[in-house]
């Protein structure tokens, strides 16, 4: 009888630990993954129309970086999966997080059916809980005078340091 009780307790413990790990993985997988604000030196936003970068904005202020990260973190994972570097849209915005230790993390934002989506390349797509349009979102994060008109092919953008 004692042997059966020990086996039952062991199996119960294994099941509880397994379920806990599955639940932890599931809940962490539902959230958008972004670098921490302290790891980011700047965020570059590049408006792309028909595979050409046409407008560039850069955000350096910690308060603006935090504001953008909070908007992104307050999003809902969709059932859609990203299958490329950029969305298959005529118009979207490249979001390049410049990391203090070097390198970039590149994502994109686009508008579809009056909703704004944050796409992590070859990963997940998240719907932002943001009521205004995409350009008002950018205006709220960076100053209007921070815009720079550019004309660059999207392939050349990937080879640059933004």
Walk through the language-model features, giving the residues of each.
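Function-determining sites in protein domains
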Residues: 2-12, 18-162
